[in-house]
């Protein structure tokens, strides 16, 4: 069956194109603009809650390595975001936190329980709080760059501090 529509039979109030039928350039521009916005609040809340729960698990002791891995990842993401201008996180603080987490992993592998010594809790709690704040403020683009950097670091690329940008107001 061949249907031949004349221009006069189409309602002019109807949309001529569907919203997703755009040129590749327009799609890239729209995606580029999305990179400038923060992630949705619900996503930020979920990620922050997971970090806080992992910290609580380490505080009370965990039979699973996952909370220690999660806190270590959050620690590096917070550092990478701070280097991009989202908060303050000194290199010395990173070194101290890294030593703390190294001890958590060593002890956990030796005895099967991953726990955070009480003396080190406040240091990591401050980092998790910074990460929580960064998730609510940093753009999707900054979070994507930090995540890509974390994946390269986990794959074996050595950590190299970026020239820190001036911190955005918190």
Segments predicted by a language model, with ranges:
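Arg/Lys-rich, low-complexity, intrinsically disordered N-terminal tails that contact nucleic acids
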Residues: 1-30
């Amino acid at each position: 069956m061949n249907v031949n529509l004349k221009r006069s039979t189409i309602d002019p109030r109807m949309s001529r194109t569907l919203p997703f039928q755009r040129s590749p350039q327009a799609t890239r521009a729209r995606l580029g603009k999305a990179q400038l916005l923060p992630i949705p609040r619900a996503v930020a809340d979920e990620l922050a809650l997971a970090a806080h729960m992992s910290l609580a698990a380490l505080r009370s002791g965990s039979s699973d390595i996952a909370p220690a891995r999660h806190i270590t990842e959050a620690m590096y993401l917070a550092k990478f975001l701070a280097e991009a201008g989202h908060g303050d996180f000194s290199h010395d603080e990173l070194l101290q936190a890294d030593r703390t987490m190294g001890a958590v992993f060593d002890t956990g592998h030796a005895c099967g329980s991953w726990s955070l010594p009480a003396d080190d809790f406040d240091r990591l709690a401050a980092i998790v709080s910074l990460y929580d704040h960064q998730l609510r403020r940093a753009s999707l683009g900054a979070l994507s760059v930090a995540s890509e950097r974390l994946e390269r670091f986990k794959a074996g690329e050595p950590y190299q501090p970026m020239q820190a940008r001036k911190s955005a107001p918190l």
